């Protein structure tokens, strides 16, 4: 058992090192894209399933409340946070539409959709991205593995942050770190003189 624990930590560290080499440009581009959208008076919608939903909600909470420093609230909505709405849509046998319907109702030109999917193939996330495209929104996608179907939907203005791993647990860990990194970069760009 002790050896298994060491393997988990070693794999996580190796994935972090690989991501630190591969992802800075994409993370920087994503942060600047979000900052520009916010400066233009737009908002961020975030979505994901399971652990990805938790990461999407963490991002929205960090935007509205704060990340590490006190600052004005920033407009963000976690589309997975309203259980009544999700079950109402899902009850009508439209599970694939649980996020797309919200994107069509709440998303506007210039808004950002933060779409988080470990493998990039979750039908409801893919449908949300398709809806965001029709609303002329910009997509920031957190994926892993080979990016899945989601990666193929992205245009030149969109940003994919693809974790260099095939293991779901490692991808999810790196998604959380990436969300924290995005929050830090957004805060430090918009409010450069705030103290931690």
Curated annotation (Swiss-Prot):
The organism's place on the tree of life at top rank: Bacteria
Gene Ontology BP, a term: DNA replication
Entry keywords, A to Z: DNA replication
S-S bridge residues: none
SIS domain ranges (all copies): 34-196
UniProt cross-references to InterPro entries, sorted A to Z: DiaA, GmhA/DiaA, SIS_dom, SIS_dom_sf, SIS_GmhA/DiaA_subfam
Keyword Ligase: no
One annotated GO molecular function: carbohydrate derivative binding
Annotated SUPFAM superfamilies: SIS domain (SSF53697)
UniProt-listed PANTHER family: DNAA INITIATOR-ASSOCIATING PROTEIN DIAA, SEDOHEPTULOSE 7-PHOSPHATE ISOMERASE / DNAA INITIATOR-ASSOCIATING FACTOR FOR REPLICATION INITIATION
HAMAP family on file: SIS_DiaA
SUBUNIT field: Homotetramer; dimer of dimers.
Family of the protein in this entry: Belongs to the SIS family. DiaA subfamily.
Function: Required for the timely initiation of chromosomal replication via direct interactions with the DnaA initiator protein.
Protein name according to UniProt: DnaA initiator-associating protein DiaA
Organism: Erwinia tasmaniensis (strain DSM 17950 / CFBP 7177 / CIP 109463 / NCPPB 4357 / Et1/99)
Encoding gene per record: diaA
């Amino acid at each position: 058992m002790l050896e298994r624990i060491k393997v988990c930590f070693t794999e996580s560290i190796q994935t972090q090192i690989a991501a630190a080499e591969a992802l800075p440009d994409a993370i920087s581009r994503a942060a600047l894209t979000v900052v520009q959208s916010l400066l233009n008076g737009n908002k961020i919608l975030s979505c994901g399933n399971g652990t990805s939903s938790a990461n999407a909600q963490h991002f929205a909470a960090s935007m509205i409340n704060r990340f590490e420093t006190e600052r004005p609230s920033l407009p963000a909505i976690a589309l997975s946070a309203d259980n009544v709405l999700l079950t109402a849509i899902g009850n009508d046998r439209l599970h694939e539409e649980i996020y797309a319907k919200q994107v069509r109702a709440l998303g506007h030109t210039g808004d950002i959709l933060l779409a988080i999917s470990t493998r990039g193939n979750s039908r409801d996330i893919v449908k949300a991205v398709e809806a965001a495209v029709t609303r002329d929104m910009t997509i920031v996608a957190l994926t892993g593995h080979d990016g899945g179907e989601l990666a193929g939907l992205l245009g030149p203005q969109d940003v994919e942050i693809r974790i260099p791993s095939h293991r779901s647990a490692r991808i999810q860990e790196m998604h959380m770190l990436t969300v924290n990194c995005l929050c830090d970069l957004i805060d430090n760009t918009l409010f450069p003189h705030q103290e931690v």
